[in-house]
């Protein structure tokens, strides 16, 4: 079994970093439609996400802004990837993770692939379902904190988001040790 893992929210100043791990049950017929989630329009991501969820074993892991502040974003990202894999509860012979660094995963072979979310189908799939899940989470937070425009900025440090922080203050879900806060 081959597993792909990716994260989303690393560059955000609000909310968790979220990782997904994906193992296809069998090679899906939509494989050629997969791409890095950042390159896909929202509607296409959501469509593919539903197909991925139907045709794969998958798991997610979120690491809160509180933990990010304690262990830093790099370590939090690796922990999210490790936890997503552990949550799968599968023994994979090969695990691909997006990026330069390998999390602590007990699999026969674990490889970090730079730009893996554009190269490895399982990482592409993980990228898509992670982005869709985190975007939906930000949409829910937007209902609670509408002045911060989270539906639009998804927690990233846009000009509007930074202006909202200046005007309304830092929320408990902001990553307080990020330089932009």
Curated annotation (Swiss-Prot):
One of its GO terms (cellular component) is cytoplasm. A divalent metal cation binds at residues 6-7, 98. GO terms for biological process: DNA replication, removal of RNA primer; mismatch repair. Pfam families: RNase_HII. Residues 1-181 form the RNase H type-2 domain. Its EC number is 3.1.26.4. GO terms for molecular function: manganese ion binding; RNA binding; RNA-DNA hybrid ribonuclease activity. It comes from the Bacteria. It catalyses: Endonucleolytic cleavage to 5'-phosphomonoester. Keywords: Cytoplasm, Endonuclease, Hydrolase, Manganese, Metal-binding, Nuclease. InterPro entries: RNase_HII, RNase_HII/HIII, RNase_HII/HIII_dom, RNaseH-like_sf, RNaseH_sf. Manganese or magnesium. Binds 1 divalent metal ion per monomer in the absence of substrate. May bind a second metal ion after substrate binding. Belongs to the RNase HII family. Endonuclease that specifically degrades the RNA of RNA-DNA hybrids. This is Ribonuclease HII. The gene is rnhB.
